[in-house]
Curated annotation (Swiss-Prot):
EC number: 1.2.1.41
Name used for this protein in its record: Gamma-glutamyl phosphate reductase
Any one GO cellular component localisation term in the record: cytoplasm
Gene expressing this chain: proA
Protein family membership: Belongs to the gamma-glutamyl phosphate reductase family.
GO terms, molecular function: glutamate-5-semialdehyde dehydrogenase activity; NADP binding
């Protein structure tokens, strides 16, 4: 039996065991897990330090190390996310619709678990707990495969979860970690159609593309964030400055951070010096600029075609000058990763057009794209941000981890 077959069989059995759990039992488990994460934070941080030390030895960038790092404060945040999931309404068993048909059959459509979820993700170890809490709340078993850079952190977090499951009398195989981060095993997991009901990749463009090309199990595509902010001709420039600085510098390593700035030519000459001076006071940002805007910056490099298609996840921002709203919309739809896009404008009609015509899961008017987040949207911890249109789109909370089933009751009807 291969490693993937063993994980798959255990996960499938756990998914059946989970079907009988009540909302109360699930919430008790999550509440206890939140406490255990805090109590065992020293152990988790010690294991995380092993990953951080290796990252530094390998010359990983400051931004990527930040994605990997766990502190007492961050573990507290993870714990609070678990508690929030416990407090959310349980979607399992909810009636979507019900009716009696012409044959007298009583037909009810209810929400049910997906079954076994596999998740392949990179760097951020908090994903282990976020994904488990959402899967468990929806009676799903989950197989996790993190990146090798976060292996010790993920092992520690999954160990804490499994210990809590055992202590409360649940099947610990409700969560399993693929501890060998080899590409061959990852590809085997992508092909485990006998066991895995859905695969959710969460990471960079290379990971997402690999999964799209090689997966045989159903996939919900998430999260590459080539995010644009368009500063319109009518924009409040002080507002635009604040939004761009927040979206780019607050946490550049996340998928809802801005990667590209589009500026209307009528405001470029005034806005660029305003932005450049203000952003320098926060953090040095490298601007990669088109020919039209290059001379307006004190410090910039010429942009390449590839820059406009890149999720930098760093203090880098591509810049494009446009002559109209039409050009801005066309440009963004050409390069968007369908995640989050924003416009800063005073023009209501421009705002409405932008929101209707931009092909993305979340489209903002006069606000930072950093808000695209399950917690912010009231969904609790998210399992990912879907950039596709089938099944789920945008931040995926509990409902995105459910399917539906028809329950039909009769009294002897046969079809004539």
């Amino acid at each position: 039996m291969t490693i993937i077959e063993e994980l798959g069989k255990k996960a499938k059995q756990a998914s059946y065991d989970l079907l009988g759990l009540s909302t109360i039992e699930k919430n008790q488990m999550l509440t206890q897990l939140a406490k255990d994460l805090i109590e065992k934070s020293d152990f988790i941080i010690d294991e995380n330090q092993k990953d951080l030390q290796k990252a530094e030895e390998n010359g990983i960038s400051e931004v990527m190390v930040d994605r990997l790092k766990l502190t007492a404060e961050r573990i507290k945040g993870i714990s609070e996310g678990v508690l929030q999931v416990a407090e959310l309404e349980d979607p399992i068993g909810q009636v979507i619709k019900g009716y009696t048909n012409l044959d007298g059959l009583k037909i009810v459509q209810k929400r049910v678990p997906l079954g076994v979820i596999a998740m392949i993700f990179e760097s951020r170890p908090n994903v282990s707990v976020d994904a488990f809490s959402l899967a468990f709340k929806t009676n799903n078993a989950i197989i996790l495969r993190g990146g090798r850079d976060a292996l010790h952190s993920n092992m520690a977090l999954v160990q804490v979860i499994r210990e809590t499951l055992i202590r409360l009398g649940h099947n610990p195989d409700a969560v399993q970690l693929l501890e060998d981060p080899s590409h061959d095993l990852a590809e085997a997991l992508m092909s485990a159609t006998e066991y895995v009901d859905v695969l959710i990749p969460r990471g960079g463009a290379k990971l997402i593309q690999t999964v799209k090309e090689k997966a045989k199990v159903p996939v919900i595509e998430t999260g590459v964030g080539n995010v644009h902010i368009y500063v319109d001709a009518t924009a409040d420039l002080e507002m635009a400055k604040s939004i761009v600085i927040n979206a780019k510098t607050q946490r550049p390593s996340v998928c809802n951070a801005a990667e590209s700035l589009i500026i209307h030519e009528e405001v470029a000459e005034n806005f660029i010096p305003l932005l450049e001076d203000a952003i320098e006071a926060v953090h040095k940002v490298e601007f990669r600029v088109d020919d039209k805007g290059y001379s307006l910056f004190k410090h910039a490099v010429k942009a390449t075609e590839n820059d406009y298609a890149t999720e930098f996840l760093d203090y880098i921002l591509s810049v494009k000058i446009v002559s109209s709203l039409d050009e801005a919309i066309s440009w963004i739809n050409r390069y968007t990763s369908h995640h989050s896009e924003a416009i800063v404008t005073r023009d209501i009609q421009a705002a409405e057009r932008f929101q209707e015509e931009i092909d993305a899961a979340a489209v903002y008017v006069n606000a930072s794209t950093r808000f695209t987040d399950g917690f912010v949207f009231g969904l609790g911890a998210e399992i990912g941000i879907s950039t596709q249109k089938m099944h789920a789109r945008g931040p995926m909370g509990l409902e995105a981890l459910t399917s539906s089933k028809y329950y039909i009751n009769g009294n002897g009807q046969i079809r004539e």
